[in-house]
């Protein structure tokens, strides 16, 4: 008596594995992207608090703007958190660039602003706080990959805008 699998049995197993991976991979990718966005939201909440402390201590700039992150040598000590280390930045001028995002935090004469743009340009998270106001957060998506990330933030007080 012969033992083993027939060609048909092997093909059926390969087909089932293919179907399962075709269904699971997009769900996995979406979950990973939402996790990245959640990490950014958490880190940028620290940036909001740090920018608020900066304004309380030094006030809004009289003219122009003050970059609060980056690595051009002039921003050291502007924030009371080591945001560049937390975001794992590489050297850059006015922005902090990590593996997945490019960050910018600054204050000008009337407001503070932060943004975190996904390096593949599928979505951008940003927030603005004018004098005496509160942080207004928004998420803008450019494609199908960014849309679920922004929609996941909708119920948390974020305004959503997109171009799919």
Question: What residue ranges belong to the model's regions?
Answer:
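N-terminal single-pass transmembrane signal-anchor helix
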Residues: 1-32, 40
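Short linear sequence motifs
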Residues: 18-22, 47, 96, 133
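Conserved hydrophobic/amphipathic alpha-helical signal-anchor segments
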Residues: 22, 30-69, 79
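Periplasmic/extracellular, small/polar-rich flexible segments of pilin-like filament-forming proteins
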Residues: 57-164
């Amino acid at each position: 008596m012969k033992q083993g699998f027939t060609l048909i049995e092997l093909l059926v197993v390969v087909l089932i594995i293919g179907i399962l991976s075709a269904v699971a991979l997009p769900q996995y990718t979406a979950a990973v992207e939402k996790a990245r966005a959640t990490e950014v939201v958490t880190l940028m909440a620290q940036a909001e608090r740090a920018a608020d402390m900066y304004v309380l201590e030094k006030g809004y700039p009289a003219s122009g703007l003050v970059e609060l992150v980056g690595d051009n040598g002039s921003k050291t000590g502007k924030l009371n958190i080591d945001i560049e280390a937390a975001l794992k930045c590489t050297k850059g001028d006015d922005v902090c660039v990590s593996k997945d995002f490019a960050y910018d935090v600054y204050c000008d004469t009337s407001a503070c602003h932060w943004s975190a743009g996904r390096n593949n340009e599928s979505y951008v998270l940003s927030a603005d706080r004018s004098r005496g106001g509160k942080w207004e957060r928004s998420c803008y998506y450019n494609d199908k990959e960014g849309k679920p990330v922004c929609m996941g933030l909708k119920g948390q007080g974020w305004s959503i805008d997109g171009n799919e």
